[in-house]
């Protein structure tokens, strides 16, 4: 049996709350499993079987979650697609990955329960396909089985003290590996999963655990400061997606909220390294069951959460090298007992003969109190070949004085050749998911340079 089926028949769990909906309604494990069975019946009526590949397009909703789990229960493969993608790209993805059925949230209305054929649970069968945030062309579809998701979940639950008496907010999209990571931690423990309600931060504070990106953490801190008398259940926050300002995590401690910073990737089913946030730059040590090694400064990974491969031509193509490791293309060093991520090997550029790693510069810039988010990119330069420029989102309107303050701050913190020669407002309209694409930013910068 799959976890939800198991909890539905266990006396200690069957009548316990499993899910809190966007409307604030509660579903027990029995009621949840009934909803999933109704969705299984819907899928079977449409012709979905164990050999099918099914896609869903939509923002997080109860029906999308039921579809995700029902597809797995049927033994089919499920692929989530970002609803912000243009229709043409969605069609191209479905064609390229030979998707048999594509459902939108509006397709999942009026589900009725009928007798369903129950596929025997197979934890090692291909179950999920998750798109990577590919920088060029179509993203790759990473295939995981249920066991890999549960193995990944176990390590995070152990670190963050997550058990059946806790709750986690589904704050990240299900089409992204980070959103799926939340679901599998919930299913690993038999805990509660909460959907955000209209007031995101009010519903967040009803949960014990939550996953956020740093900009959301800053907004949460602002919310707590604006509502000093509010009571809250939140005690643990997993951070990801960008550089994390130390001042921000230290401020959360004043509210009794522990934050955790880490390092993960789609191919490993989410988080691989993590630790309680501190003043050091590293991401901690590998979580339970993960293995790593550094080869010519490149991080290689295997172990708990490792994907089966990439989906191509209705087959699974291996993603590991001959030694069984996935080569991440991330540059890292082991320092003071933990892994420190230097940046992407393919982000590095040369300026006047000097190697420049953009993430190293970003790590310094983000420590300035006025900076929410920053990306450093190479800009063509006749004398040096390329020079660094910074795209910045300040927590105040972008202005000459804000830039000058930042430049003064960097004078004694970065070597001169690493200091950006120009600053531009970060074009936030490019944000389509959890993180902004460097490729899109580079294209935006190139067009800007052409115009000027």
UniProtKB/Swiss-Prot annotation:
Catalytic activity of the protein: 2-succinylbenzoate + ATP + CoA = 2-succinylbenzoyl-CoA + AMP + diphosphate
Record flagged with keyword Nucleotide-binding: yes
Listed Gene3D superfamilies: 3.30.300.30, N-terminal domain of ligase-like (3.40.50.12780)
InterPro entries membership: AMP-bd_C_sf, AMP-binding_CS, AMP-dep_synth/lig_dom, ANL_N_sf, MenE
GO molecular function, one term: ATP binding
Superkingdom assignment: Bacteria
Pathway where it operates: Quinol/quinone metabolism; 1,4-dihydroxy-2-naphthoate biosynthesis; 1,4-dihydroxy-2-naphthoate from chorismate: step 5/7; Quinol/quinone metabolism; menaquinone biosynthesis
One GO process term, biological-process aspect: menaquinone biosynthetic process
Keywords: ATP-binding, Ligase, Menaquinone biosynthesis, Nucleotide-binding
EC assignment: 6.2.1.26
PANTHER family: ACYL-COA SYNTHETASE, MEDIUM-CHAIN ACYL-COA LIGASE ACSF2, MITOCHONDRIAL
Function: Converts 2-succinylbenzoate (OSB) to 2-succinylbenzoyl-CoA (OSB-CoA).
NCBIfam families tied to this protein: menE (TIGR01923), PRK09029.1 (NF006539)
HAMAP family, per the entry: MenE
Family of the protein in this entry: Belongs to the ATP-dependent AMP-binding enzyme family. MenE subfamily.
Entry protein name: 2-succinylbenzoate--CoA ligase
Organism in which the protein naturally occurs: Haemophilus influenzae (strain ATCC 51907 / DSM 11121 / KW20 / Rd)
């Amino acid at each position: 049996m799959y976890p939800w089926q198991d909890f539905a028949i266990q006396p200690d769990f069957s009548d316990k709350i499993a899910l809190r909906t966007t409307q604030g309604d509660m579903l027990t494990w029995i009621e949840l499993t009934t909803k999933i069975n109704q969705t299984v019946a819907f899928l079977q009526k449409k012709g979905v079987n164990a050999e099918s590949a099914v896609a869903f397009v939509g923002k997080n909703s109860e029906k999308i979650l039921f579809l995700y789990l029902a597809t797995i229960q049927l033994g089919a493969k499920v692929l989530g697609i970002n609803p912000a993608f243009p229709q043409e790209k969605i069609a191209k993805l479905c064609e390229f990955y030979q998707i048999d059925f594509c459902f939108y949230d509006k397709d999942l209305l009026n589900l009725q329960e009928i007798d369903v054929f129950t596929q025997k649970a197979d934890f090692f069968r291909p179950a999920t396909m998750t798109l990577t945030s590919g920088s060029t062309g179509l993203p790759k579809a990473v295939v995981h089985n249920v066991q890999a998701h549960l193995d990944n979940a176990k390590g995070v639950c152990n670190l963050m003290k997550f058990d059946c008496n806790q709750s986690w907010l589904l704050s990240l999209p299900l089409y992204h590996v980070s959103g799926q990571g939340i679901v599998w931690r919930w299913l690993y423990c038999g805990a509660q999963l909460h959907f955000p309600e209209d007031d995101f931060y009010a519903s967040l504070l009803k949960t014990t655990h939550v996953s956020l990106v740093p900009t959301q953490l800053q907004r949460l801190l602002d919310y707590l400061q604006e509502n000093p008398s509010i009571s809250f259940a939140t005690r643990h926050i997993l951070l990801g997606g960008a550089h994390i300002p130390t001042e921000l995590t230290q401020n959360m401690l004043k509210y009794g909220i522990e934050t955790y910073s880490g390092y993960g990737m789609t191919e490993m089913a989410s988080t691989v390294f993590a630790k309680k946030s501190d003043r050091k730059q590293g991401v901690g040590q590998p979580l339970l069951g993960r293995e790593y090694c550094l080869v010519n400064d490149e991080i290689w990974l295997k172990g708990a959460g490792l994907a089966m491969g990439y989906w191509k031509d209705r087959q699974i193509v291996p993603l590991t090298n001959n030694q069984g490791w996935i080569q991440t293309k991330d540059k890292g060093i082991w320092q003071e007992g933990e892994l420190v991520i230097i940046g992407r090997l393919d982000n590095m550029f040369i300026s006047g003969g000097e190697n420049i790693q953009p993430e190293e510069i970003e790590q310094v810039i983000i420590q300035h109190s006025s900076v929410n988010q920053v990306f450093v990119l190479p800009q063509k330069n006749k004398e040096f070949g390329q020079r660094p420029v910074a795209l910045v989102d300040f927590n105040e309107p972008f202005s000459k004085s804000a830039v000058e303050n930042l430049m003064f701050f960097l004078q004694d913190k970065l070597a001169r050749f690493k200091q950006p020669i120009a600053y531009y407002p970060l074009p936030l309209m490019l944000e389509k998911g959890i993180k902004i694409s460097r490729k899109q930013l580079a294209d935006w910068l190139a067009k800007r340079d052409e115009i000027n």
